[in-house]
């Protein structure tokens, strides 16, 4: 939240505070470790308002638009789309022709492009008429820059950051490997140079910013909690 957010002015009665603390303490650790937990929580929080607007029969105005149009992407869909774009770029760079002609399984090819903290489990390989493996997703990367420092990724409806957090977690190890960067430096450069997002829901943008920050702070050997570069994500309002 912003430092001047009204949320910091809210004071709960002690009994309500204890109820809330008990609810939080009962949440499984896996929920806290998931980068998209806050986003899904916010979507469920908005579901009542969304249903009320949809059932009212009234015209949807700019104030109602964020709640009505909010629909976050399931993790496997995010992974599939990124694996067959960024993953295809990485596989095309890593896999020499001899591997594509000699490797006997799709799993073997995926293992050849894996790095610590990186895998592309949804990346698809297919076999051509000559029994050579090829990467169908290569068509998605035509025109991509050779250097990842020049790659600009934008999610124009980024919500709470599901896509940009996932691609952050895949770009960091790739840039570490290619550019021989430390984890801390790679995290900073991916935030500064690669990932961008726009969103009409101001609260979602705040959640997205926190999700990216949390991913960077939690990244192994990246310095933990620290000041990060400014994020290239913005609340675009409803003026367009």
Located regions from the model:
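P-loop NTPase catalytic cores that bind/hydrolyze ATP
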Residues: 32-46, 83, 203, 207-210
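Short, charged low-complexity linear motifs
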Residues: 23-30, 58, 116-119
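Non-catalytic nucleic-acid substrate-recognition regions in nucleic-acid-modifying enzymes
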Residues: 1-40, 48
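Generic structural signal for hydrophobic core residues of well-folded globular domains
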Residues: 27, 44-49, 85, 89, ...
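Extended, well-ordered alpha-helical segments in internal regulatory regions
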Residues: 48-52, 170
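Short coil/turn segments at secondary-structure boundaries
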Residues: 32-40, 52-61, 93-96
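SAM-dependent methyltransferase catalytic region
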Residues: 59, 63, 67-240
């Amino acid at each position: 939240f912003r430092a001047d957010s009204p949320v910091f002015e809210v004071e709960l009665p002690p009994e309500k505070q204890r109820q809330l603390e008990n609810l939080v303490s009962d949440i499984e650790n896996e929920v806290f470790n998931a980068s998209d937990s806050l986003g899904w929580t916010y979507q469920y929080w908005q579901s009542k308002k969304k249903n009320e607007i949809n059932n009212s029969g009234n015209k949807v105005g700019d104030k109602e638009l964020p709640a009505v149009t909010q629909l976050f992407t399931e993790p496997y869909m995010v992974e599939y789309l990124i694996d067959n774009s960024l993953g295809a770029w990485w596989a095309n760079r890593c896999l020499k022709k001899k591997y594509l002609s000699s490797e006997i399984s799709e799993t073997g090819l995926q293992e050849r492009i894996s790095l610590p903290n990186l895998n592309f489990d949804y990346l698809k390989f297919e076999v051509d008429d000559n029994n050579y493996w090829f990467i169908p997703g290569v068509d998605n990367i035509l025109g991509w820059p050779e250097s990842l420092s020049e790659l600009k990724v934008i999610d124009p409806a980024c919500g709470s950051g599901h896509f940009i957090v996932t691609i952050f977690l895949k770009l960091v190890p790739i840039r570490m490997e290619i550019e021989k960067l430390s984890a801390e430096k790679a995290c900073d450069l991916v935030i500064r140079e690669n990932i961008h997002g726009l969103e009409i829901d101001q609260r979602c943008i705040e959640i997205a910013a926190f999700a990216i920050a949390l991913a960077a702070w939690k990244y192994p050997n990246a310095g933990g909690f620290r000041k990060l570069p400014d994020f290239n994500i913005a609340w675009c309002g409803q003026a367009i």
